[in-house]
Structure formats: structure tokens, C-alpha cells
């Protein structure tokens, strides 16, 4: 009798151990499935990104998190081999570019997340940037006195776009910094050399409100190129006057000349993988053959930050190739 009780208890112990093993196995499978599903969602559908700078103010603030859709334009498959969503990858291995079908194309005005084109290394390991698309493949873009023209049509800045302004008060009047801040001015500074002269960042709507105050003699966009020299002046001029600049797209025949070569040199040599250099007779040596044109293999986009006077964007470092686009914010 005692032996039968012992055997029964031993069987119960074995059965209990088997149940715990099954539970552990079920939990492990569930954990692996959940992890795999989360990775697939981040890879193919949605991913959160943190805004690293003030270049998109006032639309997006530095430190904000945005959810980026990879479904709109189609998810880009990995271009390097490494641990997903980590900095580790195997150097020297670059996978071919392929994007799954999306349900829309990039439109003017879209805010996109992309890999910073200037950096070297695998495309999908480059730093993430966020900007607004202003120029599309096939567009001719020109910036004059801070106004953006696309195909000769002025493009209004987004309602929350911010820029630098210059304000002159009427003689004998005063305006407090607090009142300017209350009206929407940011980063306010007062001229040390001219009484009643202020500089500040603000949206167009805030600038209109401030301009209506009786103390204001003049309010206009602030331009800096005339006050600077050297590389600083050149960069400022690019912020305020740029182009005209043709934005190439896939299948375009890009004709080269001494005038256009500086615009497209990086695009052709870095992103189109051509070996190109100018010849003394006005021709170009293109992949070992003299000529004047190249066929473009992918689309390109011109992007700007909404905080126009405090943004390093396509005015400074060029176009965004299609294979660098991550998704829509």
C-alpha cells in the first residue's frame, strides 16, 4: 500500500514537471513570436523616431517623438547585414536596394524621415533626419529672397514654418520682450548698435500679429548674407537665394556642362556610382568614355526644414536619393 502511494506521488511529480516544461515552452514560443512580430512591425510598417534638432520648429519640436509610416511609400528592405535596430553590422556586405509596394508616392509637402546622404557607410546605418519635401523629380526649384519657387510658381511655407525676422520700432516707442514672446516670437535679441531694432524667430502668423502693433515701424524677413564674408556668406546666400536647380528623376537624361557639373557632381559620383570628371574640351569622361550626359537611375528630392533659417538641408548638402527615404512622418 505504501509503495503504491509512493508510485502515485512520483507520477504526480513527473506530471507536474512535464506541465511546467510545457508552460515554459509555451511562454518561450509566445515571447519569440511577440518579438518577431514587433521586429516585423518596425521593419515593414511603423517605427518611432526622436526629433534631434530644432530644424522643424514650430511644426515639430526638438525632443518630440514621431511615428513614421513605412507603408505609405513601401518598406525598404535592409541594405546591410547585421543585428536589427542596433549599430552592429558586418562591414563590406551591402545588399541590393529593394522597396516593397506602397499605396502612395512622395508628395510635395510631405514630412519624411531619411538617412543623411552626406555620411558614408551602408545607407540604412546612416543617421536619421527629418525634413519637408519641397521639390520632386522633374521640378525646377529656385529660392529668391527666401521665397521658394517650383516651376516658376511660388510655394507658400507651411503655416507653422518659422524664420528669422527684423523689427524696427517707431522713434520714441518701446516694446518689451515679454510682449513679443506673448505674440509668438522666439529667440529674441536686441541690436547693440541701433535703438529699437530687434531680431527674432517667428511663424508667418505670429509676424503678422506683431506687425499690427502701433509701435512697429517695419517688420521684414531678416537676411544675413550681406553682413558676412567667406564660407559663412556663401552658406547664408544658399539659405536665401538658391538655384535655379533641376531635380532629376529615374530615367532622366542629365546633360553635363561646366555650369551644371558643380550641382550634380556628388549625385553622379556618390549615388549613381559613375566615374565622372571634366575634360579640357568641355566634354566629360564618364565611366571611361567621353560624353556629355548620364542616365539617372533613381528619383531625388529637395527637402527643407520648417525652421528655414536654422536648418541644414538640401540647400547645404544636396538632394535626398530615393534609396535613402525611410518613411512618412
Model-derived features: where do they sit?
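Short, intrinsically disordered low-complexity segments
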Residues: 8-10, 41, 49
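Alpha-helical transmembrane signal-anchor/signal-peptide segments
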Residues: 45-62
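Soluble "head" domains of membrane/secretory-pathway proteins
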Residues: 2-23, 62-329
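Hydrophobic membrane-insertion alpha-helices, especially the h-region
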Residues: 26-44
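Generic hydrophobic/packing signal
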Residues: 38, 43, 53-55, 135, ...
